[in-house]
Amino acid sequence: MILKRTLTTFENQNLKRCKIDSEIEYGRKKGEIIVYKKRQRATVDQPCSKEPELLTSSSSSLTSKEESQQVCSDQSKSSRGRVRAVPSRFKDSIVGTWKSSRRKGESTESSHDDDDVSLGKKVKGFSGSSKLHRSKDSKVFPRKDNGDSSEVDCDYWDVQISYDDANFGMPKKSDASRKGVYKPEEFTVGDLVWAKCGKRFPAWPAVVIDPISQAPDGVLKHCVPGAICVMFFGYSKDGTQRDYAWVRQGMVYPFTEFMDKFQDQTNLFNYKASEFNKALEEAVLAENGNFGDAEIISPDSSATESDQDYGPASRFQGSYHEDIRTCDGCGSVMPLKSLKRTKDSQPEELLCKHCSKLRKSNQYCGICKRIWHPSDDGDWVCCDGCDVWVHAECDNITNERFKELEHNNYYCPDCKVQHELTPTILEEQNSVFKSTEKTTETGLPDAITVVCNGMEGTYIRKFHAIECKCGSCGSRKQSPSEWERHTGCRAKKWKYSVRVKDTMLPLEKWIAEFSTYTLETQMLDKQKMLSLLEEKYEPVRAKWTTERCAVCRWVEDWEENKMIICNRCQVAVHQECYGVSKSQDLTSWVCRACETPDIERDCCLCPVKGGALKPSDVEGLWVHVTCAWFRPEVGFLNHENMEPAVGLFKIPANSFLKVCTICKQTHGSCVHCCKCATHFHAMCASRAGYNMELHCLEKNGVQRTRKSVYCSFHRKPDPDSVVVVHTPSGVFGSRNLLQNQYGRAKGSRLVLTKKMKLPGFQTQTQAEQSRVFDSLSAARCRIYSRSNTKIDLEAISHRLKGPSHHSLSAIENLNSFKASFSFRAPFMSVFCFLGATFSEYLRKILISIYLVTHQEADFTSFRERLKHLQRTENFRVCFGKSGIHGWGLFARKSIQEGEMIIEYRGVKVRRSVADLREANYRSQGKDCYLFKISEEIVIDATDSGNIARLINHSCMPNCYARIVSMGDGEDNRIVLIAKTNVAAGEELTYDYLFEVDESEEIKVPCLCKAPNCRKFMN
């Protein structure tokens, strides 16, 4: 084996041993043999001897015996004067001195060493006449402008190279390397190095590799910026795989120069010395050119003289099959089966898997068609016409022009020829346009024909929208980006993909050159807005329930922020959400739209009818409070009264042309999702359960509110969703508000018993429950076990009446007038007398006259409505055996959604008294019925109250409770309202809304058996 120190890459050289008796005899005395390499003559016009800065010239004759002895004696002694000997494991090798070439490349003391250095060092070059380029930011790999790069010896150099080009391929010694710290830039692919994985890890022999073509995918995924990829010699502990690493500055050292320092390491970090010795021997063989199992295929591996004629693949014909080819993209050598031909590539072009992916993603130069490689340096420019990247050098872009392109448009040569938009023509057009801007503005066409992806459309300058001519869109107007997607174009750049049909000029250029007016900066006026609202639409008629606030959709209310209900349209809102003063009489309150019932009010921002409407500063235009909240340009002049709404004319006009994804209509102004371009009306999103958030923050001493709406794709809609408020103190929603503000939540009823079992809890069988009693014991002394035979039966309603042969609906029709007139004694007595004495025909006539003359009039206040509810409650509800727990409340007749059912009555006590009563009821084993209506007032219906206390809890209720204020200093009342349509005989339930408690000890189990049961009421 012959070991050369000056090789920086893997190289197979034909070395010839010099047979000089005197030199060999002297070397044997020192334990060394000096090998001389026969010098070859240069065969090019400018030999390497003419580059004194690059390569040291060598002598053509051998030195004398005395000179060689002096050189060898200087090299064989260390700084202490000791004679260096070859390690025992290299006794069968022909080895020179370890440090004979450490700094000899820079000195000219020995002519023999100069010969070794001059012939051993290599420079990076090209087989063509291209000039080498390398930027300062290059980490590991040199710049390659084509795929024919190779490493050649100076003796076979066939290209004229300058001084800078020659130094490019050689690692430059920096100040840091002189101090023992080497940068990754100083090493190239194929260099043998000592690499360390950490400060406490040993230095291990390794080779620098190309991570793209030589490293596994797992190594490439964990790429570290500013580091080089190395492959360690030797095998891992399983003995089958190689180890790879990304090494940074200070953890990599030249192999030859640090051989003496690292070959005698003792701390190998759990590695065996035998493994280290095998790796070292493998590295020594690799430096000599004998790779063995460690041979790797490198795109930058050196080419021999024969390789220049037959290509890189000819080097592997001896050990590989004949179907080995090189990738035309990166130059990697691999089997032909793993190479692919892409649709966009040339017929004879073969690409590897990695390069084919880059080709499909347009990661290649549009001029030279060279695929982008991580090792490539230089500048790239993206064409604004076709979205293709181009080498700056390929288009002869200077550094000054490259800086100017950051603020200007760039077009590749193909786009320049196709559209004739050279920079000089653009400058002339801009100059002409500036001079004639005022004269051409008035003569602009209102519409122009545009084309994209083979589909035509009409661009309307007034609305900055495009009307498609495909036939299926009709008269629908779309924004340029939407129409671009509609045509099937994937460029996502409508400014350049949408072009004017006549001149094929990009639409953005046409707008910039012939119009200074865009719709984004256009200010609307009343006439234009009314013209946008004149189009026909289908009104969305919504059911406004009193369960939730029509603005924030919360179900909770508080003493200082009560839920109020309009006496006419039955719309429920919070006082703060609608701007209602606390001094107003809430029993006869009507909303702003119902103050003038003869005039119909509609929102100008959405097609939804009714709701919480507020007037704007424009006469005749009204808006929903929710629409004004989530429209950034709209606000309220008075935040306390929440009116009037201002900023309607600041809304972009193109928002009135968007199609709502929920109601499928264009009437009104649409908002879009904060994550994508999905458009919808704010009120439609609120009714559909979309996630809506208000972010309140303070910036520079100014209170700011940011609104966010999420579409159904980015957040799953929920019918019970509410407006979530984000503040610096926390996030407030419908359920977690109970955790953040104790004592301010809506009142709830607590029902507890001693023997509560979790749903699904399996009790013992009767065989296990049966006890073995003494045969002589009395029956009254035995423990009584309750029978469970009727637990799973359906709910049964109890009606106080005798036997009946008629259906329930027939009986309800006969007694319907009683519910309307509720025990009016004079009329009822007359009716009974007439029914007993007159004929049936006269009886029906009198009943009809009575119903017509005594119809239920509209209530002027909530107090009157509540009195009527108390008189007729026995005709609406009854009690019965519940299928949930104990006794329950049942509907005696069919009840419509939103209809008031019954008032929850009891004794009003303070909070402290209610706590004492609850403890007393528990000690007696009684069920307690407590309903909290405010922070200090609780209604106790345990001993005194009406039938409403029997209503049970359900996670899917058909009723909800509403706390209403009577005004004039009177106490609040609790009313149960139907949430859905309830059939006669159906059990009435509502959600208790207990305060959420995380402790398992005081959890109250839920027995409702609903599909969405929460298992616990709290």
Swiss-Prot record:
It is an enzyme of class 2 (transferase). GO terms for cellular component: Set1C/COMPASS complex. Keywords: Chromatin regulator, Metal-binding, Methyltransferase, Nucleus, Repeat, S-adenosyl-L-methionine, Transferase, Zinc, Zinc-finger. Residues 875-993 form the SET domain. It catalyses: L-lysyl-[histone] + S-adenosyl-L-methionine = N(6)-methyl-L-lysyl-[histone] + S-adenosyl-L-homocysteine + H(+). It is found in: Nucleus. One of its GO terms (molecular function) is zinc ion binding. A zinc finger (C2HC pre-PHD-type) spans 600-634. Zn(2+) binds at C955, C1006, C1008, C1013. Belongs to the class V-like SAM-binding methyltransferase superfamily. Histone-lysine methyltransferase family. TRX/MLL subfamily. This is Histone-lysine N-methyltransferase ATX3. It comes from Arabidopsis thaliana (Mouse-ear cress).
